[in-house]
Amino acid sequence: MGKVIGIDLGTTNSAMAVYEGNEAKIIANKEGKNTTPSIVAFTDKGEILVGESAKRQAVTNPEKTIYSIKRIMGLMFNEDKAKEAEKRLPYKIVDRNGACAIEISGKVYTPQEISAKILMKLKEDAESYLGESVTEAVITVPAYFNDSQRKATKEAGTIAGLNVLRIINEPTSAALAYGLDKKESEKIMVYDLGGGTFDVTVLETGDNVVEVLATGGDAFLGGDDFDNRVIDFLASEFKSETGIEIKNDVMALQRLKEAAENAKKELSSAMETEINLPFITADATGPKHLVKKLTRAKFESLTEDLVEETISKIESVIKDAGLTKNEISEVVMVGGSTRIPKVQERVKAFINKDLNKSVNPDEVVAVGASIQGGVLKGDVKDVLLLDVTPLSLGIETLGGVMTKVIDRGTTIPAKKSQVFSTAEDNQPAVSIMVLQGERELARDNKSLGKFDLQGIAPAPRGVPQIEVTFDIDANGILTVSAQDKNTGKSQEIKISGSSGLSDSEIEKMVKDAELHKEEDARKKEVIEARNHADSLAHQTQKSLDEHKTNLNENDANEIQNAINALKECVKNDNATKAELEDKTKLLAQAAQKLGEAMANKNNAEQPKKKDDDVIDAEVE
């Protein structure tokens, strides 16, 4: 029998799991992460991006990046919740046969179609992980979802090519994941605070039965709302300091949104964090930077009413269940936003019991869904997933060439260094452009980041030794460092999620590399010929200036003319490899007389031999 995957189709993030080997296991997506952003983006080139790739480009494409589609799933256009969604969501919500839909570039999409694109990615990633076709799934929904919302969720699964065996409630699924169905009869509360929704449910468990006694929730209360409080605070502070209303700039607002989310996460473990957004906007006086410290105490004061609203919901649901707080025997915390310390503190204080946090709150619902799938279909074999670098990593060197440091397919963790040098005499700094891809030219690869190494001691080009080190740890965090071996000065950049690409992009880049292999090789040969010519012209000019008095006028003029001709050829972007090599050969022949004159006078200086470990690819 085929495997059944359990899917938590979340407002902000989605997750999937499979029941195998008598246990439920989370399935990592192709990016190596256990959760996938529930985001779909439409690019100007006609591409459709889903998940991490969609989230990454949200800053530059906010109007065509769809998130929180679950909030309008199965809603009629005239419902109050739909009107509330219109106020909060940046994309256009329209009426399609009385139901909510969205409009992107003049085309209308239903929430089911958008959700199906997320489910299709999950399905494809699960198939990649399991090594077989996946056609069946158990999908979870909030306990307060009505029939039309549940039907819409199932329709999304059908569009994605999945036979949805069961739609089950998220709190029921969470209870299964915690193994609460195996305990003696007791009453538990599931507190589920996700990225976009809040759900609190009281259940009675026992004799392998999980029964919902009462449930409540808010389709518009979640981690996003906590982020919005931080955004409003930062925007207000920025306006008071600069007079600029940053929220009117959609790209700046998206950067602010991402920074607020990161700050919220950091404050779950730290007491203070710094939001640093350089060049966030500009006015007549020049570029503006947003730098602000945010303490946990300030964050808690900004979001206090949101936390208290969840406590009010708890009180109502317990009352609806016909129980008192003292009759609740266990509290299960679900959803990524339950990591917020104040949330845990208030729930614990209200119920007066320790919280059950034994399973990852981001994964627990998907785990429970997979258990339900296991109940329906049975156990399956174990599968192991290994992580490797999906594409080569390197830096841009002289002439716009990508010089690889770590090759594609390298098992991580991995660390490798190469030594480069400068491109100009007395060059005080080098710029390190970190690249990812398989193409020969830097411009054809993905740029991951850039940093400068300052303070290089004055020296002729080719003499300084700059050691560049690529270090990928077991978490996939890439750190690139550069050190001047002479002065000891160093600089580094840390790049999270070194892939930086969707799988479709990875596949396209590998195919492009194969398709353009010969063309790229020819371009690289021209660049190498140009670099060699430039170096010869530079060195010969230097020697001629120093030893011109040892030559007769005709020989000196012949050499100078050959130098000038080669320099002009180097400057010509359309010069071919043959033309560059011909001019280089002519200069080399003319320069023989200079070498003879220098030898005859016995004052020639032998050029310092390069270190064998130094790569003959200079950094600009």
From Swiss-Prot:
InterPro entries hit by this protein: ATPase_NBD (IPR043129), Chaperone_DnaK (IPR012725), Heat_shock_70_CS (IPR018181), HSP70_C_sf (IPR029048), HSP70_peptide-bd_sf (IPR029047), Hsp_70_fam (IPR013126)
PROSITE patterns tied to this protein: HSP70_1 (PS00297), HSP70_2 (PS00329), HSP70_3 (PS01036)
UniProt xrefs under CDD domains: ASKHA_NBD_HSP70_DnaK-like
Alphabetized UniProt keyword annotations: ATP-binding, Chaperone, Nucleotide-binding, Phosphoprotein, Stress response
Induction text: By stress conditions e.g. heat shock.
HAMAP family listed in its UniProt record: DnaK (MF_00332)
Protein family (similarity comment): Belongs to the heat shock protein 70 family.
Alphabetical list of NCBIfam families matching this protein: PRK00290.1 (NF001413), PRK05183.1 (NF003520), prok_dnaK (TIGR02350)
Name used for this protein in its record: Chaperone protein DnaK
Organism: Helicobacter pylori (strain Shi470)
